[in-house]
Regions:
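Asp-based, Mg2+/Mn2+-dependent phosphohydrolase catalytic module
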Residues: 1-12, 20-22, 94-97, 119, ...
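N-terminal helical cap/lid subdomain that shapes the substrate entry/recognition surface
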Residues: 3-116, 128
Length: 231
């Protein structure tokens, strides 16, 4: 272990923190909006659709009571996750078959891009003897995304544990699995509202910006450095 740290463990959010869902032009090829004028799904529309697929909190379209119920529970049940996001994409103007095609990319671990410093951070923490966990509000198994990227000690996924950030229960599950205390744990995420919930238990918290991967080369390294964990 290289030096001492005030932390025994670091918890990471997934989307917008370790990885980002970044569109490929092929995903939108042949798509048009399901409106009277059949508008083009241009770069601006693509960016907004991706934002709506990945925003950690809040909602971006009008919802019926049934759709709202699915939205509120989306990270607990895969079928509700599908229902909620297909509703968002349909309300955003996509035909159903286009909405289903785009949604299929969102839940495919192979479609998620790691931030440039994710491998360095995961490897560096392991070498220092600092335990790691991914704590994510999600309704699909993201573990395959880490193949060839890095090793994580524990995955605490909302749909598997029945709790959603910022509920302290999901963070406590991570602490228990790692065998660490909140006082010696850092949570890193892109949502002050959701990820910052770890502070309720006494964890430290580092906020990162969910920028495109090409624009955030060392955000994780900087966040750890600011909390006394140089890599």
């Amino acid at each position: 272990m290289d030096g001492m740290s005030d932390f025994d463990a670091v918890l990471f959010d997934f989307s917008g923190t370790l990885f980002r869902l970044e569109e490929d032009e092929s995903w939108f090829r042949g798509m048009e909006l399901d409106t009277e004028d059949k508008g083009e799904v241009d770069a601006h529309v693509q960016a907004e659709l991706m934002r709506r697929l990945t925003q950690p909190t809040g909602r971006s379209v009008s919802m019926t009571p049934q759709a709202l119920d699915a939205w509120m529970k989306r990270d607990l049940e895969p079928h509700l996750h599908r229902e909620a996001y297909l509703h968002v994409l349909r309300e955003s103007g996509l035909a159903r078959h286009h909405a289903e095609a785009l949604y299929s990319h969102a839940i495919d671990p192979a479609c998620w891009t790691p931030y440039p410093d994710t491998p360095t951070v995961l490897d560096g923490l392991r070498r220092r003897g600092i335990k790691t966990a991914v704590v994510s509000n999600i309704a699909f198994d993201l573990r395959p995304a880490f193949a060839g990227v890095g090793t994580v000690d524990e995955f605490v996924l909302s749909f598997e544990v029945g709790a959603v950030k910022p509920d302290p229960a999901i963070f406590q599950t991570a602490l228990d699995r790692l065998g660490v205390t909140a006082a010696r744990t850092l949570m890193v995420g892109d949502s002050d509202e959701a990820d910052g919930g770890a502070r309720t238990l006494g964890c430290a918290f580092a906020l990162v910006d969910p920028l495109p991967t090409r624009e955030r080369r060392d955000g994780l390294i900087a966040a750890l450095w600011a909390h006394g964990i140089p890599l």
